[in-house]
Curated annotation (Swiss-Prot):
One of its GO terms (molecular function) is ATP binding. This is Uridylate kinase. UMP binds at residues 53, 74, 135-142. Belongs to the UMP kinase family. PANTHER family: URIDYLATE KINASE, URIDYLATE KINASE PUMPKIN, CHLOROPLASTIC. The gene is pyrH. HAMAP family: PyrH_B. The keyword Kinase applies.
Amino acid sequence: MSKRITRVLFKISGESLSTDSGNRIDEVRLSRLVSELRAVRNSDIETALVIGGGNILRGLAQQKELQINRVSADQMGMLATLINGMAVADALKADDIPCLLTSTLSCPQLADLYTPQKSEEALSQGKVLICTTGAGSPYLTTDTGAALRACELKADILLKATMHVDGVYDKDPLMFTDAVKYDRISYKDFVAQGLGVMDVSAVSLCMDSNIPIRVFSFVKHSLEQAIFDENIGTLICGDA
């Protein structure tokens, strides 16, 4: 990528805040995220963050288990992202990092209602923008919500941090030892092949706005590396 990056949007999974030992929001992992967001902000890059809620509840996965309907399950998942967002916002403020916590659902006692205008203003003021509750509608994932925010805010790149893989593969590398990783793949090829890791709808949205996506491992790499090191993860873009 030759274009200078000045505004990024990170999609961070809720799992990145939790541990295998059962801590839904782990102090060490939260501290790491705050430290890395500070590093990105200190590089004079406007920083937005969309966070998932899988460490607390996975709406679709737990729908049958909890015997609730799909809409309610998805709405519960949205609220889980708000809980994570509140934790991140308070941790940022405790470290003297200005931020704006937003929600696509109206929760005035907890977060500002998301609007592109208010979010643009926060970014231009150097605040870390935290976007919660996904796209604000059931049946749409936080990946799609992240793509929508990236398009609305005209982000230079969408960076998806994953906990299980280090990029896009031709098949699931956790199941197939011969899976081949792509260093770079076009939007159209990704959609045509129906590859995993990123929702096809999210990729299609970014394709329409020509916003590149980098999928990378948050276990192996930092947020800052994902911006500046073109050799990590997989870049999904207009040409391969």
